[in-house]
């Protein structure tokens, strides 16, 4: 529940949280407006900025551009695409389609190619370093390539329940575990803040 997730985030000291449930063509028009409604209800009542969004999941690459556009039209201020994680059989070409569509974040992009890293940088699409088990097995590759070629990185919890929320210390450890030096960690947090600020301007 968004209310519970936000309450737990507030108790953990979060300043902002994106509510980005998994969506596809079957539920996007139901989920996003309801998350938007919940975020509006909480505004001014909680010490956390609540950003309504969506994670477009297992969509054929050919549909992703229209789905990103449709999600924004429904009120999603933060649009994520479920990338080519090694933990699931995500269709090849999803990473490229997400970048072309101008998603805010490409989640767990797996063994992302150099070409897609460069394109993500060009399109200002951030790549996710994830704290979630399974999806995180390619964190090292994503981090190494992003640092080498200058792509933006964010750290995400990929929370599916309130227990998945992590502390700042845990986030730092996940980043260091991916091979990101301490001197770059602040840049990752700054990118996350910038994305949230941009998303809040869409509300």
What is each model feature region?
Residues 1-33:
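Metal-associated gating/positioning segment near the N- to mid-region
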Residues 3-5, 62-70, 168-172:
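Catalytic cores of alpha/beta
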Residues 8-9, 17, 71, 98, ...:
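Generic structural signal for hydrophobic
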Residues 22, 151-165:
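Short acidic/histidine-rich active-site segments
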Residues 23, 57, 84, 133, ...:
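Catalytic metal-binding/acid-base residues of hydrolase active sites
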Residues 173-203:
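Mid-to-C-terminal alpha-helical segments outside catalytic/metal-binding sites
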Residues 28-129, 137-140, 196-203:
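Extended substrate/RNA-proximal surfaces in nucleic-acid metabolism proteins
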Residues 9, 21, 108, 127, ...:
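Conserved, mostly hydrophobic/aromatic
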């Amino acid at each position: 529940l968004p209310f519970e997730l936000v309450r737990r985030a507030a108790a953990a000291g979060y300043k902002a949280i994106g509510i980005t449930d998994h969506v596809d063509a079957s539920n996007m028009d139901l989920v996003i407006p309801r998350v938007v409604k919940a975020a509006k209800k909480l505004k001014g009542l909680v010490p956390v900025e609540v950003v309504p969004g969506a994670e477009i999941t297992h969509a054929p690459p050919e549909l992703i551009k229209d789905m990103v556009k449709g999600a924004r039209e429904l009120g999603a201020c933060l649009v994520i695409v479920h990338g080519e994680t090694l933990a699931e059989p995500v269709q090849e070409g999803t990473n490229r389609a997400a970048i072309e569509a101008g998603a805010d974040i490409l989640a767990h992009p797996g063994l992302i190619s150099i070409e897609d890293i460069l394109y993500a940088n060009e399109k200002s699409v951030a790549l996710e370093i994830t704290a979630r088990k399974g999806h995180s097995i390619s964190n090292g590759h994503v981090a190494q390539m992003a640092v080498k070629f200058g792509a933006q990185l964010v750290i995400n919890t990929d929370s599916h329940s309130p227990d998945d929320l992590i502390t700042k210390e845990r986030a730092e450890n996940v980043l260091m575990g991916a091979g990101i030096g301490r001197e770059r960690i602040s840049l990752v947090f700054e990118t996350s803040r910038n994305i949230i600020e941009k998303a809040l301007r869409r509300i």
